[in-house]
Amino acid sequence: MDSRRRPSKPLLTSSGEVLHRKQASPVTDEDQIHRSPKASDALPLPLYLTNAVFFTLFFSVAYYLLHRWRDKIRNSTPLHVVTLSEIAAIVSLIASFIYLLGFFGIDFVQSFIARASHEAWDLDDATPDFLVDDSGCPPPCPIVRTPNLDRQVLATLSSEEDEEIINSVVQGKVPSYSLESKIGDCKRAAAIRREALQRTTRRSLQGLPLEGFDYESILGQCCEMPVGYVQIPVGIAGPLMLDGFEYSVPMATTEGCLIASTNRGCKAIHLSGGASSVLLRDGMTRAPVVRFSSAKRASELKFFLEDPENFDTLSMVFNRSSRFARLQGIQCAIAGKNVYVRFTCSTGDAMGMNMVSKGVQNVLDFLQTDFHDMDVIGISGNFCSDKKPAAVNWIEGRGKSVVCEAVINEEVVKKVLKTNIDALVELNMLKNLAGSAIAGALGGFNAHASNIVSAIFIATGQDPAQNIESSHCITMMEAINNGKDLHVSVTMPSIEVGTVGGGTQLASQSACLNLLGVKGSNKDSPGANSRLLATIVAGSVLAGELSLMSAIAAGQLVKSHMKYNRSSKDMSKVAC
């Protein structure tokens, strides 16, 4: 058995004082009388005699049964025919075996448990120890505990070992970001980091949930240094009738009236026969920036990349990055001696930023063969353009480019939307078109497309930051059939969504994708699930635009928000 022990360390109080351990004193007869009872005291014989009896019984009955087994084989007697004495011997053998296994087996298992607990502290001798320093010096600053401690964290952190790690994190001896790798338990690491943060900041995190989340699922993928998770309510709008199918659309939001308004738009579309959608483009982009010694040399690269005869070779090099990546086009822009190369490729059911970046890196490495003087400044030169409002996305598109339209009956406009067609058409022209132009909007020719896009993105595990370009939308309204019907459409050139990777693998977001029927990758037609999700986003935006514009035209916007978007709590009583 491994008998190594951790060195004794001085215990510290919360104020940094050292608590000295008492030295062991000899055991007297009085101590033996008042000692705690042991489990072996319940045996009728002393422990060593009990062990001797069972050892003797085990080997004697084993010898007897083996002798009887040999006699039966010689006499051709069936082995299953047993006498009363043989039955007693079998029972004695089993009983003695169980006793010996229980007595010696527990000690054997405990030896491995003790060894594992000791070796866990010896994994990396080069890193700072979790234990408090032997010097007994007080920490550089006193640890002040907040009176309002988080009860759920205290319930999780119950061992002295956790307390030692917390003190090490607070004192800066152990980096907070390394807790997962050192401890090996993501939930425990989050609880320790959370408690250390509360002690450092002297602020309570009570109200931020810790329990009920799989912290293993976000390790190395979604979030670093977690201390909990934020709860956002998820509501359902719909059913949305789109391309002949009904969809219940999950929306995660804290804005009252948003889901109710979108739901009203879905109802108006459903009563009018549904909406239809068209996918115009499907291609993610990445644009590195490279530099040459002269503008002439930079133009040579531009001509080489845009030459159709070179596309097949470049495509073959690019597509090595993934079995789903397929290069669609290359667009170059020059600024002096710098070249911005915008690659566009399909990415299957993934949103595709990592996939296209790997393909771009393959092409850059390939180009170094013929362009030795090419200096790669960055894998992204903002000509992509990611997470920023940009004209290139508005004009050329990025991700999925979708158009969604519907024809709303005049009766539905009056009864459900509580307005009329002429008022909607006029408001759309003056607000969404002329008003946005006066404001100098870039892709913002709509009422509130980003509201719906953000809510669906959060619910389905998309990148919320890509709401910027994904919300590019122009809303059009026109009276048709002699003014009896309303034609409404939304054109969204850069919806960036995926159904695999990133936050889509989290349990809650995965459930919302499953509700829409687009969970995971489509095995039969790669990319079909992400394309369907993009059309659902556009259809939901269409419903939201229709309802909000109707509320504004009817003068109901302020009234509805006062009813659904105001808290009834007295905010003056909420503690800071």
UniProtKB/Swiss-Prot annotation:
GO cellular component labels: chloroplast membrane; endoplasmic reticulum membrane; peroxisomal membrane
UniProt similarity note: Belongs to the HMG-CoA reductase family.
Reactions listed under catalytic activity: (R)-mevalonate + 2 NADP(+) + CoA = (3S)-3-hydroxy-3-methylglutaryl-CoA + 2 NADPH + 2 H(+)
Region annotation (Disordered) ranges: 1-35
GO BP, one annotated term: coenzyme A metabolic process
Primary localisation category: endoplasmic reticulum
PROSITE patterns, per database record: HMG_COA_REDUCTASE_1 (PS00066), HMG_COA_REDUCTASE_2 (PS00318), HMG_COA_REDUCTASE_3 (PS01192), HMG_COA_REDUCTASE_4 (PS50065)
Species name: Cannabis sativa
UniProt-annotated location(s): Endoplasmic reticulum membrane; Plastid, Chloroplast membrane; Peroxisome membrane
Glycosylation site positions: 319, 565
Biological pathway: Metabolic intermediate biosynthesis; (R)-mevalonate biosynthesis; (R)-mevalonate from acetyl-CoA: step 3/3
Pfam family membership, one: HMG-CoA_red
Gene: HMGR1
UniProt protein name: 3-hydroxy-3-methylglutaryl coenzyme A reductase 1
Active site: 255 (charge relay system), 387 (charge relay system), 463 (charge relay system), 561 (proton donor)
Molecular-function annotations in GO: hydroxymethylglutaryl-CoA reductase (NADPH) activity
NCBIfam families noted in UniProt: HMG_CoA_R_NADP
Tissue: Expressed in trichomes, leaves, flowers, roots and stems.
Listed InterPro entries: HMG_CoA_Rdtase, HMG_CoA_Rdtase_cat_sf, HMG_CoA_Rdtase_CS, HMG_CoA_Rdtase_eu_arc, HMG_CoA_Rdtase_N, HMG_CoA_Rdtase_NAD(P)-bd_sf, HMG_CoA_Rdtase_sub-bd_dom_sf
Membrane association type: Multi-pass membrane protein
Spans through the membrane: 42-62, 89-109, 532-552
Keywords on record: Chloroplast, Endoplasmic reticulum, Glycoprotein, Isoprene biosynthesis, Membrane, NADP, Oxidoreductase, Peroxisome, Plastid, Transmembrane, Transmembrane helix
SUPFAM superfamilies: NAD-binding domain of HMG-CoA reductase (SSF55035), Substrate-binding domain of HMG-CoA reductase (SSF56542)
